[in-house]
Amino acid sequence: MELYFLRHGKSVPRSDWDGDDESRPLTEAGVSAMAHAAWTLARLGVTPDVLITSPLERAQRTAEIVAPALGLEGRLSTERCLGKDFGMKQLRRLLRQHSRAGSIMLVGHNPAFTTIIHKLTGGHVALSKGGIARVHLAARKSSSAELVWLLQADELVGLASSNSSPPSVAAQDTEAAEPAQD
């Protein structure tokens, strides 16, 4: 089984947001970077069977940007357990629920993702906002796995820029984004 841990894109800083943390959106730069990332992931042949996202706005938006590029429209699901308290117990439950899938992409948050990757692989990783890690899990019940690759957000954007122009996100998709500072 292949697991992709995609951390949500760059979001509006808490200090600049008057609403609750759950509704904090991506910045305009975060939306743009995730569009580049989605294009790069498609070019790399990333084709998960299932895309599962946290219910928090910034993760939802990230998943909405990535899904069409990876051919996952209609296969996006939201799981409350992918919120900030996501851990091994919740991961095992998701793996059981999607036992027929060969690969799963999870869109969520740190420190949960880096903690789980460490528990699975034994390695310490840093996962930037908009970064992704691919982990190979040999057996679904195993707590042992291999980190196949890790791409930070700037690497995904760089790969997109070096190949050709990735598609931009439609103007309507960026209207909800807040200022690009942070």
Predicted segment positions?
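Hydrophobic packing residues within well-ordered alpha-helices of enzyme cores
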Residues: T62-V66, L91, I116-I117
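Active-site-proximal alpha-helix that buttresses catalytic centers in soluble enzyme cores
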Residues: E2-R80, D85-F86, G123-L127, N163, ...
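Non-DNA-binding regulatory cores of transcription-related proteins
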Residues: Q97-A133
